[in-house]
Each structure stands twice: as structure tokens, then as C-alpha cells.
A protein has these predicted regions:
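N-terminal signal peptide c-region/cleavage motif recognized by signal peptidases
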Residues: 16-17
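Cleavable N-terminal signal peptides
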Residues: 9-10, 20
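Bacterial N-terminal signal peptides that target proteins for export
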Residues: 1-9
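Domain-level marker for long, solvent-exposed, non-transmembrane regions
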Residues: 21-263
């Protein structure tokens, strides 16, 4: 019963986040925790009880902390199962592959404890945050056939990133696709270099254009485009498509921030 109540608290406590955070960050809440698509972190809370046979109070607390951390990391994997990867693949499907699951579990060593609560009965509640950046996102993305990027016409762009404003309902995913009117892909997993994918995935999300332009991923001089939601893809009109085709370097570096529509 205690663990069940605490798993609810792990999500409910996030609702009370500061107003500025809630207004700017795109957060997906799940049964076991949350995904901050702006910071690209997964947050979950775990609980640990002290062993009955501990030799002293200090040993009991250390073991309770270890158990709470292990429980929280297990919940991180459950959160990842609820993450959308691309149009046809979800986190649960990717993590059903043993190799992918073991690699993801190995990345959980990079999780950091954010808060710990020590209860009167010796139990510990611990909240951990695990970065999707630095490899975890790359592990979750499906295998991709090698593609040679198309040459970019015209002089190099002075823009440092692309801010994509979405019109219409759209949910975050690790590998969004932006297509033109003919269905040709303008941006997606194949557009981003492997080093950039390992560094920080393919995209970040925010809830306002101002925060997207201030995001480190956008750089100092991003260009903005508007697209519309088209089911599992984002549709760029002729003007937006032309801009995207001219931003080859920014796209290859994954310097894309998507502004989600207001709920």
C-alpha cells in the first residue's frame, strides 16, 4: 500500500511545480513519473524500506537509500515505456528488445538524486532525474539505414537553429518528422548526425516561442517556421519548407526546438 501511494505522489508532487516552470517546460506525466521534454530529463520517485536485520541505524539508512534509488530507476524505465519514439514505434516496443533494455539500464547510472525524504519509520523516498541526452535517446531510437544528406543550395545560413511553431494538436516524441506538401521528409531522425544524436537526441520541446528562442539548442540567432499537425507528422508549407531546406547545418546538428500548441 505504501509503495502505491508513493508512486501516485511521485506524479502528483510535480503538479505543484513553480508557475514559471509549468508555463515554459513541456512536461509529459505518466503513471510512474514524468518526462521534461524541455530539459530532456526523465523524473521518477522510488521508495526504500530499511532492512530488519541491519547492524545499526546508519547501515539501515544506507540500505534504505539504495533500495529507494533502485526503485526510482526501475520506475524511470517504466516512464520510458510511455514515451513516443516516432510515428510507429513507442518506448515499450523498443525496451522489449533485450539488447536495448540492457543498454538503457546501463545508462541509468547517470541518474542523479534530486531529493530524498527520510521518514520516521526509517523508510526513504527518493526522486531521481535521468538525462535523455548523452546517449539514452540514441539507444531508444530505432535502427536507421545510412543516408547521405542532400547538398544544401545557396550560401551557408547565418542562423544557429530552427524554432518550429506547431499549429494543431501534437504530442512530443523522440524523433518527430517534418514533411512538405508532397510527403517528402524535411527533418527527422535521418537528418541528424550520429554525434549530435548521441549528444542530445534530435529535438527539444517548449510551450512558448520565447522560451524556444532562449533554449541553448537554438543558439543566438534561430530562425522560426510554422508548421501544422498532420497526424503522425508535421506539415511544412512552401515557405517553411524552403527555410528548412536552407538550414542543413542546423538540422544536422539537431538544433531544432519545437513549440507545442497550447492545450
Amino acid at each position: 500500500m505504501r509503495a502505491g501511494l508513493r508512486s501516485v505522489c511521485a506524479v502528483a508532487c510535480l503538479v505543484g511545480a513553480p508557475a514559471a516552470y509549468a508555463e515554459e517546460h513541456a512536461v509529459q506525466r505518466t503513471e510512474h513519473g514524468s518526462v521534461d521534454w524541455t530539459e530532456l530529463t526523465v523524473v521518477a520517485e522510488g521508495s526504500g524500506l530499511p532492512p530488519e536485520d541491519a547492524i545499526d541505524r546508519s547501515a539501515a539508512r544506507l540500505e534504505a537509500e539504495r533500495r529507494a534509488e533502485d526503485d526510482a530507476k526501475a520506475r524511470v524505465l517504466e516512464v520510458l515505456k510511455a514515451v513516443a519514439i516516432d510515428a510507429g514505434v513507442g518506448g515499450a516496443e523498443r525496451l522489449s528488445n533485450e539488447r536495448v533494455r540492457l543498454q538503457a539500464e546501463g545508462m541509468l547510472r547517470r541518474c542523479e538524486a534530486r531529493t530524498s525524504r527520510f521518514l520516521s519509520d526509517g523508510a526513504v523516498d527518493m526522486t531521481v532525474a535521468c538525462p535523455l541526452e548523452g546517449g539514452l535517446a540514441a539507444i531508444l531510437l530505432p535502427p536507421l539505414e545510412t543516408r547521405t544528406p542532400e547538398p544544401v543550395d545557396g550560401p551557408p545560413s547565418e542562423h544557429t537553429g530552427v524554432v518550429v511553431v506547431v499549429e494543431g494538436e501534437y504530442a512530443p516524441r523522440l524523433a518527430p518528422r517534418i514533411v512538405d506538401d508532397s510527403g517528402r521528409e524535411l527533418y527527422g531522425q535521418a537528418s541528424v548526425g550520429s554525434n549530435a544524436v548521441r549528444r542530445w537526441g534530435t529535438v527539444a520541446y517548449t510551450k512558448s516561442e520565447a522560451s524556444a528562442r532562449a533554449h541553448p539548442r537554438s543558439g543566438d540567432a534561430p530562425v522560426g517556421v510554422s508548421v501544422s499537425s498532420a497526424g503522425n507528422a508535421l506539415l511544412a508549407g512552401p515557405e517553411a519548407a524552403q527555410v528548412l531546406r536552407s538550414e542543413g547545418m542546423a538540422l544536422r546538428e539537431g538544433r531544432v526546438v519545437i513549440v507545442l500548441p497550447a492545450p
